[in-house]
């Protein structure tokens, strides 16, 4: 009898369940449930209370809808029996967090509290805790806290402690009412099993936890505010388990809702980008996974913990048990290309695409591919949404150098592709300079599936082979793979993620190999990129920040330094 697991990938706008064949990793069925409430960034449901700028909330009931609708649907589509499903795995955006009561229910489920914004789920892109993040960084730097170096020198406004402190500052009564603060991935797992456990991925990358040292000392949290002194032993308490461990079994009530068997194994929760690493076939050091979409998340495994300039985090057992998982990233990649499509393409080129019956991006790719490296005469800094790694500075902005009256849209397009590749090379260089090996690249996500020119440019700029994941749903596949490990080999799953990856993870037959002539030409361009990178990014010329300040003053707002 065939065995299957279900991976459930919770995104920003919807959740997707994928049923996976354990024998070969085939994605047999999938179903998407859009979130009924979407991203709540204007006003609260029901009460209509307006939200301040930079807020981004969600309704936890939407997450339950994904379970209730999508899980039974994939079983129905595949026409299999419940007994053939031996495990469930979850991945989620992060840090997406919520306050819960002593029964494990979200505080926003209480009608008395639903009209207060801090009772709701704070989505990963909730940026209203910037003041708290700034103070965390200032105090941590003053105290020389060890955790700060593991985050590339800066703790983000998107992460757990920043968001908790915002709740404490703006609604102290809500802070007191919260029995605990959970990552949404851990809350969904708790709904399935009836037991709350935390995962080492989000605890490490988002909540200051370290496998050997634990959380920072209580004195650090007391330095933030005396009321936070016991935070980690009270509202962040709980067992922290590694990816692939069994969080528990499906409760009888939830089994009935999902149409599965009670006791079905449920894996510890995970994060969407990180869980994609084994799904791309990477379970050993020396290989960098690029999760490529609107932005890029760069993930690397290593045997040792090292400080890498501008990394977003390094966590032991954070991605694959037994290794340190490193994370870095670029704040905008696909979003930059989308910006050009929206604002930088002349009407005649759009008309040409229509007449040829081609998508606009396909025509641009075709035209841009005709140029050799350096032939456009242009160079760009890929900072349209700031710089995440390695400079960790959200107030940097984009730059294009070399315009002439003859510059064409396809030349701009190619230049922006190249700029993002140079940004990735900067990250690779930072890892190598710190002693972390990167010898081959693996790509997954939306971009590698539809832009071959981009992939070839990345191979040429980095002088590395790029292998592309066969799956279009790597997060869900990775969650399903970890579900197979949680179920174990006796149930028909796998003993380790290494064994699961050998059978379930695949790359496409075609890889992208560096063109040696292009490598030589791009090295010269990269040297010029590096000059611009350091000149504008390391403080020699702060014109980008000055322009943002002037723009803000003109609009009557403020900019965080």
Swiss-Prot record:
One of its GO terms (cellular component) is cytoplasm. GO terms for biological process: L-arabinose catabolic process to xylulose 5-phosphate. Its EC number is 2.7.1.16. InterPro entries: ATPase_NBD, Carb_kinase_FGGY, FGGY_C, FGGY_N, Ribulokinase. It is an enzyme of class 2 (transferase). Pathway: Carbohydrate degradation; L-arabinose degradation via L-ribulose; D-xylulose 5-phosphate from L-arabinose (bacterial route): step 2/3. Pfam families: FGGY_C, FGGY_N. It catalyses: D-ribulose + ATP = D-ribulose 5-phosphate + ADP + H(+); L-ribulose + ATP = L-ribulose 5-phosphate + ADP + H(+). It comes from the Bacteria. GO terms for molecular function: ATP binding; D-ribulokinase activity; ribulokinase activity. Keywords: Arabinose catabolism, ATP-binding, Carbohydrate metabolism, Kinase, Nucleotide-binding, Transferase. HAMAP family: Ribulokinase. Belongs to the ribulokinase family. This is Ribulokinase.
